[in-house]
Each structure stands twice: as C-alpha cells, then as structure tokens.
C-alpha cells in the first residue's frame, strides 16, 4: 500500500468508526471543516490531557488559563497580525485552483530530497553491510546533481522569503517547471499576499469600528493576561502559562484532511524568563518537547528537528518538530524564542506598564518569552496515521488494528459475554460494575466473539475481556491484548489493577522524566 493509498484508507476508517466526520454532511459538507465523532472526541481529549498534565503537573512553575476567542481588535495590531499575517497566493489560470506559492516550492524541494533518499536506499541494497552512506552521499553523481539543484533553488527561495519578493516566488516556480497537479500547466497568475484572519462585527450596526477578529492563535490571550496571572499567582520568573483552545485561519489551501484546517485547536505554552537567558530555556523546551513526543512510543525515527532559516517577525530562534506523516515529514510542533516582542508591543499600544521586578537582581524588565505550540488536530493525525495497521493472520485472514498508545485510546476495555444466555450477560454486567468508574469501556454482546474482537481492534481498544462459562465457576475472565492478541485468564478481582497498569496516564507521564 502506497502512502497516498494509506492516507485515503485512513480517512475512510475515521468516518466508518466514528473518529471524524465531514461537518454539515447532510448539506454536502463544508470544505476543510470536520467534526470529531464519538471515538474521535475521546482520543482528542486524551491527547489534550497528556499535554496539559505534562505542562501543569510536571512543571511547578507552569499554570493554565482559558482566554476568549474574541479579543479587543488592538490585540492583533500589537501582535503584528493585522499588518503581517499573510500568505503568498498564486492561481492557475487553467484549473482555477489556488495555491500557496511557498508550498509549491517546498513540495518541489521535498521531491528532490525524496530522489536523494531513494538513491541512498538503492546503494544500501546493492552494497549491503559494506555500504558507507556518508561516502556514498559525497561521491554518487546522481546525488551530487540533485543536491546542487536543491541548494540552488533553496537559496533563491530563502532569499525571496527574507525579502518578501513576490515576483521572485513566481520566477522560481516558472524556472523549476512547477505545474498545476490538476491541469498540468504552468499558466500561473502573479503572486499576491492574502491575510489569513477571519473578521466579523461585534454589533449589528455594521460600522467599520465594530470590526473584530476570530483569534488566529491562542498565544495572544496569554500575553494580555500575563500581568493578571503573574500578580494573582505570585509567580516568579521564570514561569509559564499554558492554554488549550480554538483558533481560526482563512487558509488559502486547506488540505490533507485535518492537517490544515480553517478551524483548529492549539496547545500553547508561553514561558517567561529574564532577558539573556532565553536561549537556555529555548534549548530546554526543545529537548523536553521532543521527549514528550518520543515517550508515546511511535518511533524516534519518525521525528526530527527543522531549524528555521527565516525567522518570524517576533523570534530570535525557532525550530519545528516534524513528524513523518503519510505525506512526508511535516511540522507537528513549533518552539520559538519570541523575545519581548509581544509584551513590549502590548505595553506600548495599551499604555500599560508590563514589566517584572526581579528581587534577585533588583531590576525591572520586560520578560522574554519562549513558546511551545502544537496543533491538537495534527497530533491526532500523527497518532492515527502511525497506529493504523493491516496485519495478516495465521489463518489467512487479516485484521485492521489501531495500535494507539494505550493511555490515549478512546476505549480502554471491552466487556464481551461469550453468549447472550446462560447467565453470562449478568456476570459480564458485574465485571462492568467493577471497572466502570475507572475506565472508559464498551459492553458488546452482538455477533461472534471474533467479529467483536475485530471491532475493538479497529477503534484501538487495548483490552478485550471475555466472560465465558468457566467464568461462572472460577470467577476469572479471559483478557485479550490488542497488540499481541495473546490471551490470559485473570481473576475478576485483579482485573482493574491489570488494566490500570497499562492505560494509566500517570505511568505515561512518568516516562517523560524516566
């Protein structure tokens, strides 16, 4: 199965099993807007809980808030979003489709990287154990040719980004022979800037002065509440403020399922520190956030850092944690050193003094800030895309299984009476009563036990508990493990402790520091 095929199958699986639905589907849906179903909302909430508790419980100096979506419009003037929150837009005249010019160039560069890696893979296969990858990359003529092409285009692209040269964007697209994937032509319009903020009116007068925005990020809610949190919480520098919430961006091209949407959810933390110490904390949060991801057990090889060559207007250092999605390595989380840009600008525009008096140094200053920002929806997609597997079984059949990290699984345990008679459902209900206050569970007595196992595999349930006739005699049940399919007999009295050991969020959190 190719990566494209896997992605299509995954999207269909999400709908079939209640993870994600196209929003307003009875009205033919709305492009790039999705609803989370009964399984999806549980997984999403577990992801958010893992992040929230890792921030606010594992760090004594990080606290949380929940700010509003609507904020005073001057907030977005101070943050720079009104003037500079734009993407470069280009249209194909033949297909009438719209694209981000920078994405077209980045996809072109990505294809060159793929060619290089395929050449390396061929060399590895040809030379076996004697393969010297470093030397091969330095001497292979095909790789050297592709590297030279990559560097030439990449250097032009970086220069165009830094200069905000829209004409050069288009010229790179033309020089590289980049064509529209639908029409196959290079009949492009000029590149122009497109502001990504949604706006509305706060009253019914329609007056331009009533214009407000749907927040494009949650971070500004933290910055404008900095003084309130610092004073009421008696917080000492360094400290952080965490928040989970919805944000909205009028994306030019919303694509790749829930990877890029117009309405999405962010998990952001702003860490305030003394000027001059920000790079120390930038390094700390860079390492800490990578540990958080790798701790889920989805393979360290599926993550990588990508340091920014072009920095945002507010940053003096920035890196992305990229994940290997079905469509390649893409940004999952950003870590940025934002300096004092935000607090400083809000102080100037509001006329309010936003400073911190440091009792250790006896000086007052505007704190610097290091930010970690991750999309809940992208994290959801990372977990699902890595977890989805089709396995061949010894009997010649196959099964679809979601090997979701157990603490994140929507349903932790399924209680399955072998038959709907002989007192088995009644005993199964007793088992339910043993675990219902501790775990999200499903009770299922319909169809054969094999079909019920497959249904639970498909939604990622770590344990299936079967109540059979022997259970009536020995008060034990058969517990089936999702990943190994191994089955063991366990006394009902010990069932809760056995399940808890694997699915408890606390054990997952301990792994970050272990």
Give the location of each predicted region.
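NTP/phosphate- and nucleic-acid-binding module
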Residues: 1-514
């Amino acid at each position: 199965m190719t990566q494209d095929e896997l992605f299509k199958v995954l999207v269909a699986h999400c709908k079939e099993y209640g993870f994600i639905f196209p929003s307003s589907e009875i009205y033919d849906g709305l492009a790039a807007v999705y609803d989370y179903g009964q399984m999806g909302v549980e997984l999403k909430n577990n992801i958010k809980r893992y992040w929230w508790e890792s921030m606010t419980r594992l760090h004594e100096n990080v606290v949380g808030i929940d700010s509003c979506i609507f904020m005073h419009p001057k907030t977005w003037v101070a943050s720079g979003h009104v003037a500079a929150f734009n993407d470069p837009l280009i249209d194909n005249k033949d297909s009438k489709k719209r694209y981000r010019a920078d994405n077209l160039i980045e996809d072109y560069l990505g294809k060159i990287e793929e060619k290089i890696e395929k050449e390396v893979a061929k060399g590895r296969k040809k030379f076996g154990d004697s393969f010297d990858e470093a030397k091969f990359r330095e001497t292979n003529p095909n790789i050297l040719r592709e590297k030279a092409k990559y560097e030439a285009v990449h250097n032009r692209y970086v220069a165009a980004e830094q200069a905000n040269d829209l004409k050069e964007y288009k010229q790179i697209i033309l020089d590289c022979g980049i064509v529209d994937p639908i029409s196959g032509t290079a009949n492009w319009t000029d590149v122009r800037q497109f502001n990504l903020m949604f706006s509305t009116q706060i009253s019914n007068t329609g007056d331009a002065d009533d214009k407000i925005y749907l927040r494009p990020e949650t971070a500004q809610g933290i910055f404008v509440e900095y003084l309130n949190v610092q004073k009421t919480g008696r917080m000492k520098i360094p400290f952080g403020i965490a928040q989970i919430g919805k944000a909205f961006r009028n994306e030019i091209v919303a694509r790749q399922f829930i990877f890029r949407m117009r309405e999405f959810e962010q998990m952001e933390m702003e860490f305030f520190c003394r000027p001059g110490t920000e790079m120390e904390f930038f390094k700390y949060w860079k390492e800490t956030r990578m540990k958080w991801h790798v701790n889920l057990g989805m393979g360290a090889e599926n993550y990588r850092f990508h340091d920014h060559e072009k920095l945002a207007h507010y940053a003096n250092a920035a890196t992305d944690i990229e994940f290997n999605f079905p469509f390649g390595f893409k940004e999952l989380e950003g870590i940025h050193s934002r300096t004092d840009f935000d607090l400083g600008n809000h102080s100037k525009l509001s006329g309010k003094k936003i400073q911190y008096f440091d009792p250790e140094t006896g000086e007052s200053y505007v704190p610097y800030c290091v930010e970690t920002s991750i999309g809940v929806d992208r994290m959801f997609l990372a977990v699902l895309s890595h977890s989805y597997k089709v396995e061949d079984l010894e009997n010649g059949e196959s099964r679809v299984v979601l090997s979701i990290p157990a603490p994140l699984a929507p349903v932790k345990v399924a209680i399955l009476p072998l038959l709907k008679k002989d007192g088995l459902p009644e005993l199964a209900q007793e088992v339910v009563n043993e675990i219902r206050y501790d775990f999200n569970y499903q009770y299922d007595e319909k169809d054969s036990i094999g079909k019920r196992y497959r249904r639970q595999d498909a939604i990622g349930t770590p344990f299936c508990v079967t109540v059979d006739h022997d259970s009536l005699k020995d008060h034990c049940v058969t517990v089936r493990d999702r990943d190994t399919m191994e089955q063991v007999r366990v006394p009902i009295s010990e069932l809760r402790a056995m399940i808890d050991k694997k699915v408890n969020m606390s054990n997952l959190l301990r792994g970050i520091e272990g």
